[in-house]
Curated annotation (Swiss-Prot):
Its main location: membrane. Residues 269-472 are annotated as: LT domain. Residues 1-18 form the signal peptide. It is found in: Cell outer membrane. SUPFAM superfamilies: Lysozyme-like, Periplasmic binding protein-like II. The N-terminal domain does not have lytic activity and probably modulates enzymatic activity. The C-terminal domain is the catalytic active domain. It catalyses: Exolytic cleavage of the (1->4)-beta-glycosidic linkage between N-acetylmuramic acid (MurNAc) and N-acetylglucosamine (GlcNAc) residues in peptidoglycan, from either the reducing or the non-reducing ends of the peptidoglycan chains, with concomitant formation of a 1,6-anhydrobond in the MurNAc residue. It is a peripheral membrane protein. It comes from Haemophilus ducreyi (strain 35000HP / ATCC 700724). Residues 19-267 are annotated as: Non-LT domain. This is Membrane-bound lytic murein transglycosylase F. GO terms for cellular component: cell outer membrane.
Length: 472
């Protein structure tokens, strides 16, 4: 009986082995199902990324970045906790994914055929290209043959396979790698003239130009490619299906558009002279008024209050407009009286009153507007008046949009200057196009201050590390 049972068990095992040999896709499917079930069982989604101002970073207000916000939303969509693991470069990131140490690689990664053969691809959520960068004011290269020196890229960069492929047709192409600097730091080194060229992703370059305007684009190294998440390789993927469903859902409910608005839209306009002037003001003027912005920030970041003041007056407490508004926050006489200040050219009085008035407007907004969007509605009202904000929200609803969604409302602001629209509104004509640009400028100024401070902090920490190393 025992012998019969043993032969039966062995026979069943052989049949299962044969089934796996004949139908290997079943084995792959089970393996993937096991991986996905492990994710669900551990109740944690492990996402790998790279520290970067657009993808993921931890600032004064906690974790932020495109990849973080998408990953957090995806984890919430699955009912899971999110664990973020950071890596120094894309090579380390893909190694971790291949070793199943993470479930998703998300770091502003452009689609690459070589990686697509090794891993599953999630849905694309924006597109970008690799570009060659040089210092503004030096000779611009228009093609690879015009490069006069080596390109410098970080060790493990995703652009290295692309450079290797291009070298086959351009044997004079040269580059070297460094493990001492991140891609963002290399962009700043180009701007400072410390290295001649680097290669970076187009959106990263646009972001860096608002911190260091001497960064200039020579030419596109590649065409635009989709930015994607990479997942473990399998011929059957429940995880991939969930990602695709989530991205489709996120697009339909406006999450993707909202993230693009937050991280990309302010990068579209780049004025070298304006950015250079602003960065100089951050270094020379802002320190004088920072204590006041911190003192009267209320529920805002002090950097936001500073950005508003720069948009209003370029941090000039004696600024005056032809319409009679005055001071660092450019207050009208009526607003000054309402906020009970006596001297609009007194920087402290003006900053306090401007902040209190903006908070007053924000606090009047309905709770149906998302908390993170209230600042933009409040700023629009600060610029053109509360009544006109009510009008544009009503107009947005009439046109089939959501009056509580800043993206919907924002695009209708210019319509307040069109007779066919304002003639039917309670408060009539308004220069809504100015309010639109006003909010966009403040968003850009705010991000520039935050990024500039982050870089200065990194430099300071690096100097301390170097001093500590020298002492030992």
């Amino acid at each position: 009986m025992k012998g019969l049972l043993a032969r039966l068990i062995i026979g069943i095992a052989l049949l299962l082995w044969a089934w796996d040999m004949i139908f290997p896709w079943q084995r792959l499917m089970r393996a993937e199902q096991n991986h996905y079930s492990q994710v669900l069982q551990r109740q944690t989604l492990k996402v790998g990324t790279i520290n970067h101002p657009l993808s993921y970073f931890v600032g004064a207000n906690g974790k932020s970045g495109i990849e973080y916000e998408l990953a957090k939303s995806f984890a919430d969509y699955l009912g899971l906790n999110l664990m973020i693991k950071t890596f120094d470069n894309s090579e380390q990131l893909f190694t971790a994914l291949a070793d199943n140490k993470i479930d998703i690689a998300a770091a502003g990664l452009l689609y690459q055929p070589e990686q697509a053969q090794q891993f599953q691809i999630g849905a694309s959520y924006y597109s970008a290209s690799w570009q060659v960068v040089y210092k503004k004011g030096t000779t611009r290269p228009y093609k690879l043959a015009e490069l006069q020196s080596d390109i410098v890229v970080p060790c493990g960069s995703a652009v290295i396979p692309i450079l290797q492929h291009l070298k086959a047709k351009n044997p004079m192409l040269r580059w070297h790698t460094t493990d001492q600097f991140t891609q963002e730091e290399l962009l700043l080194q180009v701007a400072e003239g410390k290295i001649p060229y680097t290669v970076a992703v187009s959106v990263d370059i646009s972001s860096a130009q608002h911190i260091s305007p001497n960064i200039a684009v020579g030419f596109d190294l590649t065409d635009e490619m989709p930015v994607v998440w990479y997942l473990p390789k399998s011929s059957y993927s429940e995880l991939q299906a969930s990602v695709l469903d989530f991205m489709h859902n996120a697009n339909d409910r406006g999450l993707i558009s909202k993230i693009e608005e937050k991280y990309f839209n302010h990068l579209i306009r780049f004025d070298y002279v304006a950015v250079q002037s602003y960065l100089n003001a951050i270094k020379t003027i802002l320190p004088k008024y920072r204590p006041l912005f911190e003192k009267y920030k209320g529920e805002l970041d002090w950097q936001m209050l500073a950005a508003i003041a720069y948009q209003e007056s370029h941090w000039d407490p004696n600024a005056t407009s032809p319409t009679g508004v005055r001071g660092i926050m450019m207050l009208t006489r009526a607003t000054a009286e309402r906020m009970k200040i006596t001297d609009r050219t007194n920087a402290e009085q003006s900053i306090r009153a401007g902040s209190e008035y903006l908070h007053l407007l924000i606090n009047q907004l309905p709770d149906t507007i998302a908390k993170e969007d209230k600042i933009w509605f409040g700023l629009a009202a600060y610029n053109m008046g509360w009544g006109h904000l009510l009008d544009v929200r009503r107009l947005t609803k009439q046109l089939g949009g959501d009056p509580d969604n800043w993206l919907d409302v924002k695009k209708n602001l210019p319509l307040l200057a069109e007779k066919r629209h304002y003639s039917g509104l309670k408060y009539g004509y308004a220069r809504g196009f100015e309010a639109f640009q006003y909010v966009e400028n403040i968003r850009r100024y705010y991000n520039s201050i935050v990024n500039q401070q982050r870089i200065e902090k990194q430099k300071s920490e690096q100097r301390l590390d170097n001093q500590s190393t020298e002492m030992h």
